[in-house]
Each structure stands twice: as C-alpha cells, then as structure tokens.
Amino acid sequence: MCIRDRYKDTVANPTSANIEEAKDLYLAHGCQALLAFGGGSSMDCAKAVGARLARPNKPLAKMEGILKIWHKLPLLIAVPTTAGTGSETTLAAVITDADTHHKYAINDFNLIPDYAVLEPSVTYGLPPQLTATTGMDALTHAIEAYIGRSTTKQTRAASIEAIQLIFDNLQTAYKNGNNKTARRNMLRASYLAGTAFTKSYVGYVHAVAHSLGGCYGIPHGLANSVLLPIVLEAYGTAAHKKLARLARITGISDSKLDAVAAEEFINHIRSMNISMNIPETLDGIRNEDIPKLACYADKEANPLYPVPALWGPEKLEQMYHLVQEVSEHDRNRNSEHPGKAA
C-alpha cells in the first residue's frame, strides 16, 4: 500500500468541517482507500469521509440516523491507538456540526471497517488519563449494551467478557502503560464491547455525553466515565436485576439481593474512577444550556435506544445537573433564584 497523503487535523469531537477537508484531500490525491490510525475521533472522521465519498451529493447532516448511506465505502482499514470507542468494529460514526455544535450519530452497516488491526504496541504511549477515560468508555459500551432491552445471547456474552477484561486490566494499563498483556486485553475488550453495542445499542449515558461533547467539546470518554455511575443509579429498580447479574458474574458481589448487588456494582465503578483520578463532575456546563442539551439527548435516544427505563427531557435535565461543576457565576444566580437546581 502506498500512502498518498494524510489528514491530521481531526479534533477530539470530529466536525463536519474536518470531514469535508479530509474528503477534499482524498480526492485531490486520487486516493483509493482510507486508513484510520488513531482513537475514536480519527476512526469516526474516516468513516464519515467514506460516507461522503460514497454519497457525494448527500450532505452529512442528511445521513444522521439509521441506514441513510446505502452505498459501499472505499476500502477502510482501522488501527485503533486507544482501547475505548470500539469504532473499528461498529456501524456508527459520531460527528459534530461545525456551525450548530449539534453532535449526532450516523449508523449504517457500510460504516463497519473492512479490516481492524489490534496491535497493543501502538497503545503504549497513551497517557494514563486517556487510558483511563477511553477504557471507561469501553466499559460504558459493554454495560449499556447488556442492560438494554434489545440483547441477544451473543451480545450478552460479548458484554460480559468485555466487562471482566476491563475490570481485570484497565487499572494495570493505567499504572503501567507498557504492560503488553493489559494493553492487548483492553484492545480485545474494546472490540468486544463494540460488537455488542453495534447490535444492542447504548443508552442515556451516551445520549447525554454526546450532547456535552458537541456543545462544550468535552472528550467523549471523560463524559461517559463521569456519567456512567450516575445514570446507572438513576435507572433504579429498572436496571437492578441485570446489574446484579453482572456484579455476581464478575465477582463484585455475592449478595442474593438484586438491589444490594447492583449498588455494589455501581460503587465498584465509582471506585475505579477514583483510583484513576477521574473527576465526579464536569466543568463548564451552563444552566441556560441544559434544556436544549436535554432535548438533543432525548432526540438521540428515543425511540432508538432500548434503555431500561424511558425518560423524557425533564428527567434528562437532572443528569446534567448531577454532573455539573457549579461555577461561581451559576452559584450566585442560583442563590438569587433558589427554585433552579445546580
């Protein structure tokens, strides 16, 4: 393979402008294939470029949703350098509109890469904090795929294996980035979680995280890491049975009471976050943005995501407040208007 040129300006949440620039570069150099080398952002960018090449007369925004491409992409090879998004095996690409900052997903089987290369050595240089948040992203994929209402025997098995691998290897990879076994196992976990949620989808953790990434540029893995225990707890009894089953399978709990085992499972996730210096809140979320963000999340999740419990925008607004790191400005405003939660 002769690499004609490379596009290296992809941002953490790839924008429609990134896709158009990379597409123009592909055409200018007469390229015949796409090689996505990097994390989820690079792979999503490459997928979206392929979609634009396959459907040159269809704007990217018109591809939002399910099965809007219907054309084969150029050859696409994915080489993940993070163990998190699982984009090397999924049918999704998540893009942010450069003008409106609306973050949306394109879902089409043609977006699944033709080849995925899982090579642990390319992840050795990943900083500890990115190792942590991308790993928790993979955990979110696996858990949301498992607790949803559209699972299969295969997706449940893939989710369980991914969760166990992450519990056993993520903190090792965080502490020692050159541990080949931990890095290899995390790549496998990410891949398995990707195969699971491609068929069983995700849930409200992702819907809220996508809106935060689009509006504020918050890295997707970080948003998922912070939101995961909060959203799981908010599901309440609707998720207890499946979370309890995961707790027992992974050895987190031996309680026969589903509520207790589920709580211990969620607390284990919190402990993992703490051990890897992942914060409990997210900075920069503005109160005035929350209703709009909740509507974005609601539009993304409903009715596509088979979540354990169905929420509307008002319930989703609570999730933003729960992860919000209150600024001095908002603290003053809330003291003047005590009816508004922070």
Residue spans of the language-model regions?
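Glycine/threonine-rich beta-strand-loop-alpha-helix active-site module
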Residues: 17-24, 28-121
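Short beta->alpha junction loops
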Residues: 6-16
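Short alpha-helical scaffolding segments that buttress acidic/His motifs in well-ordered protein cores
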Residues: 139-143, 186-194, 208, 228, ...
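Short, small-residue-biased leader/transition segments that mark boundaries at the very start
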Residues: 1-3
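Carboxylate- and glycine-rich phosphate/diphosphate-binding segment that chelates Mg2+/Mn2+
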Residues: 92-200
